């Protein structure tokens, strides 16, 4: 949260936000599955102005071998922002924020994966932010979950994520960059809808207890809408495969 430029209104007198959305409206979301031929699973997501690519490799042999776990696979997640992903060029390579978000995303995904089926192996997840516009962690979780499903890693459910927040004293869904910079709070949430489980819940900023509950409920509602888009993207991929197989016969 940053100091706001004088006179900047995040919600106008008609209840419209700075990008024209209403309070409970998601940004435009586009998802594609199976976009990288050399990965075991992959997904690409455009969420507002965010552009994020996720790739999964494994389960595969883990090196060095002392990292092996005899009863389960190891999940490794690397979240990275490309140097050109933000307006001010970022130094290449992982920074403290990227390392922290990698751990957060791993924690959000791990409950959904049946890793005990593949002991002594590793599942590697790479998330590359090509363009950033607030909400990269929830978009990254959403893309990574799709890529894991595409790779055929056994899952209890997809993980879908969304954030709610507070701007100009109002609880709203899916903050954009200006709202994230100049708003009062941000609450990212990840869920497994079929299990009715929350796998990520964070808060940045200040909310009353009532506002926090409202924000969490709104973020869950948004995540359920994202979940439907994930399912549609997976169906679209396998429909294409079925059509290609039918065409070859």
Swiss-Prot record:
Belongs to the RNase PH family. Rrp41 subfamily. GO terms for biological process: gene expression; rRNA catabolic process. It comes from the Archaea. The keyword Hydrolase applies. This is Exosome complex component Rrp41. GO terms for molecular function: 3'-5'-RNA exonuclease activity; RNA binding. Catalytic component of the exosome, which is a complex involved in RNA degradation. Has 3'->5' exoribonuclease activity. Can also synthesize heteromeric RNA-tails. InterPro entries: ExoRNase_PH_dom1 (IPR001247), ExoRNase_PH_dom2 (IPR015847), ExoRNase_PH_dom2_sf (IPR036345), PNPase/RNase_PH_dom_sf (IPR027408), Ribosomal_Su5_D2-typ_SF (IPR020568), RNase_PH (IPR050080), Rrp41 (IPR011807). Its EC number is 3.1.13.-. Keywords: Cytoplasm, Exonuclease, Exosome, Hydrolase, Nuclease. Disulfide bonds: none annotated. Component of the archaeal exosome complex. Forms a hexameric ring-like arrangement composed of 3 Rrp41-Rrp42 heterodimers. The hexameric ring associates with a trimer of Rrp4 and/or Csl4 subunits. Its main location: cytoplasm. It is found in: Cytoplasm. One of its GO terms (cellular component) is cytoplasmic exosome (RNase complex). PANTHER family: EXOSOME COMPLEX COMPONENT, EXOSOME COMPLEX COMPONENT RRP41.
